[in-house]
Amino acid sequence: MNKQFEGKVAFISGGTSGLGKATVYELVKRGARVIFVGRDDAKAQEVINKCKELGGEAEYKNCDITKHQNVIDVFGYIRERYGKLDFAGNVAGTGIPSTQIDDTTDDQIDMMIDINLKGLIYCMIEEIKIMREHSFGRIVNIASGAANIGAPGMAVLAASKAGVVGVTKNACFDVVRDGITVNSISPGAIETELVQSIKYTHAEEYKSYSNNMPIGRFGMPEEIAHGVCFFFEDESAFITGVNLPIDGGF
């Protein structure tokens, strides 16, 4: 693997599973030093062990990104330990099973807004502070195809992820003269751990959904990780404020 990111420091939220974990692995393969956050210490250790197998290293910090002070503490550590931050992938997110909007509870609304939007904004605030110190940075936010395509039972999730797209398209102007780009990715249906479990427990539904997708299959987490790294590459320096769908044609 080309070590194109050797010497670069990267931060990933939600790095203990799914798209975040795949992004940590891809960055390590490309030579970056990675700090990732999450809430599951056992899963984090598995990620760290895998990174060592890949010939790199990653550091983990337990962090609830919905608490701004927790986020401040993590980025204080990054500043002290590394003195800079080159890349940031704000991947952490949550959802609920398909739920009609009038059946959605207050707790569900709070959870999705707090994690998907407020937590992401807290991370961006601290990322930008460090990046401005060195007039360089690449930020990628994970939104969702739900923000762009209507579907039943997805209203609150879509609202939180549409907020991510909105933050991306506007925050990019605040930092564009500081050498910082801000872009987002809207994944379609991706075969995360949750989808893999459905693959076996609801095989017919899984097969039907896959066949109805334009490309005929679910996406893989690695394909989203490749998209994140695309925005981190030097060749993408002129791209900012873009929301890139990676959704197999949806």
Where are these regions (language model features)?
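Catalytic Tyr-X3-Lys loop
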Residues: 102-122, 136, 140, 164, ...
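Active-site helix of classical SDR
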Residues: 124, 160, 168
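Conserved glycine-rich Rossmann-like NAD(P)H-binding loop of the short-chain dehydrogenase/reductase
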Residues: 32-46
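Residue(s) in the substrate-gating loop at a strand-loop-helix junction
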Residues: 144
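Conserved mid-core segment of classical short-chain dehydrogenase/reductases
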Residues: 72, 95-110, 133, 153-156, ...
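C-terminal substrate-recognition "lid" of short-chain dehydrogenase/reductases
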Residues: 136, 217-246
